[in-house]
Amino acid sequence: MKLIPQPQQLELQEGTYRIGYQDRITLDAACSPAAYGYAKLLAGELEEQAGISLLIDRRTHTTHPGIRLLQAERPRLGREGYELEITPAGVRITGSGEAGLLYGVQTLRQILRQEGLVLPCLHLTDRPALATRGLFYDVTRGRIPTMAFLKDLADRCSFYKLNQLHLYIEHTFLFDGFSEVWRDDTPLTPEDILELDAYCQALHIDLVPSVATLGHLYKVLRTRSFHKLSEVDEPQSAPFSFYQRQCHHTLNVTDADSLELVYRMMDQFLPLFSSRLFNINGDEPFDLGKGRGKALADQVGSHQMYVDWIGKLCRHVEELGKQPLFWGDIILAHPETMQELPQDVICMNWDYDPAPREDHAQKLWAQGANQYLCPGVQGWKQTVNRLDLAYANVKKMASLAHKYRAAGLLVTEWGDFGHLQDPESSVPGILYSAAMGWNAQLPPEEELNAGISVVEYGDRSGQLLSILRTLSQQVVFNWGHVVELSEILSGRLTDETPEEFWARFLPQIQPNLHRIQEVNGTIDACQEAICRLMPAMDRSGRKRMLPFLLMSDGQKLLNRLAAIWEQQYLGSANPLHQNPVDLAAQLETWYASYKQLWARTSRESELYRIGQTIFWLADQLRSLS
């Protein structure tokens, strides 16, 4: 039996209990009103898995055994802890608090998915190792999810005992007075936030407001309304660039209007959330002190400018009655300056390398700082998330979180370069973090992959994720490479010439250029293996395989594109003997299917920008003929 996260203590015992159609789900008298919602979750699971509808009751019956839900404080378990007992007489879940009762129900739902109506007798005691186990989700760099998807995401977070969700905003909220910023988009509305916040509250998920307040304000600072607040001037007529959106576009912190702008955004956004937290972000201010603020930087240094700015924002958050969070990439250059910030501020310590640095966590710990350790699901700039890199990164960051007694583990899902990757391929990385934030005994990769295959995808063989892991590695030319080169060739990016790009980039891909046919053959084999596995999967799992099949088809096309461009710009032989015109048509046909896949989970957002890149590639390929 697979459980994610793995419980702290699990004792399997002799015997079974068979749930009958006359059983009831009984709420103890001490249960809060929220317990009825948890009972409904359980009843829905039983109907889905076994086709039986159990009545929910609040009276104790001797004639109707079944499942009892109780709330009783257990100080040693904390408010999120619970006990689950299955005996020949029935099932009993005791939550130390509301959240604990919910998590006990979620664990029983996982057991039901694997065991059906005949449950093994067991005694399970469980509680989280880390207080905060969260997901940071980018809804600003191209893909804005539908409300249905966001609720499904919250359901999945709760199912795996995550208790915090950040939706990252730069410009994709309907801020008053910002119509020039969001006029061509499909932004989230105040009602969207209120609806999602209430939905998350019922699942014991803290929906945290998260707004860019220093760097990464590309779309805001390219408008006529706010252009003058940019640290470094850029012609407003400059064409859109995925690459440039990741760089530059930092606020001029010496301009009082910049502070007024950020306060307006914060003051509009914060009242929509019930959370006691506010995430001001503040990462990667690449231009700070290099343009309009250079005089101050020469006087006090850019680091002090940063600390002073973050300090102002933190104090404003506290004045609004909330606790601030910010990214730690800049403060780590001088961790002692944490002492200049409010004592309760939380520093989000990110590192997405498969072998992240330990000294950053150690330095913040030495300063007595509250910190979250923040790994990533490794999907940005990819067609399919790199599961091998995600596991390695999450495991190391989780180990540091436990070692340095961090306040939490917050896994990130970023959407660099248009958020091409489908949300489905981020699920394994999210579950890696859920498993490792709850239990400090970090499971081996094969074991965890087998568990996710069984619990999340209903794959009784337990093989699915090992196949997806191999599939995700078959990359010669990724989406990030394609975007960079296309923007250089089209003149949207002038930092490098094509020749300079190839000189920098070729060593990264050259070992695999002669293997494109082999790599694409491995993709074909993985796709075949997924399809052959479907009979071992439940229906819901089968329906979720399309994103992996479609996106890996896209990766095959990008790999073939590498061979043609290498031939064109470096004079190499075309090992695949392919016709550029044929590849152009295949890219366009693939994009037509991709648009349908996008619409399953996302608003229109900036899908058209991905299309523009695909169409430009197709036009270039036709010009080569």
Where are these regions (language model features)?
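Contiguous, structured surface segment used for ligand recognition
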Residues: 1-133, 396, 419
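Substrate-binding groove of N-acetylhexosamine-processing glycoside hydrolases
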Residues: 2-14, 19-21, 34-39, 62-63, ...
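A generic structural motif
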Residues: 30-31, 141-143, 353
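A generic structural signal for short coil/turn motifs at secondary-structure boundaries
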Residues: 33, 93, 144-145, 289, ...
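Generic structural signal for residues in well-ordered beta-strands
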Residues: 46, 53-56, 207, 324, ...
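Short loop/turn and capping residues at structural boundaries
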Residues: 50, 57-60, 168, 211, ...
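N-terminal small/glycine-rich loop or linker at the start of catalytic domains
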Residues: 122-140, 372-381
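Substrate-binding cleft of carbohydrate-active enzyme catalytic domains
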Residues: 131-328, 338-340, 346-348, 357, ...
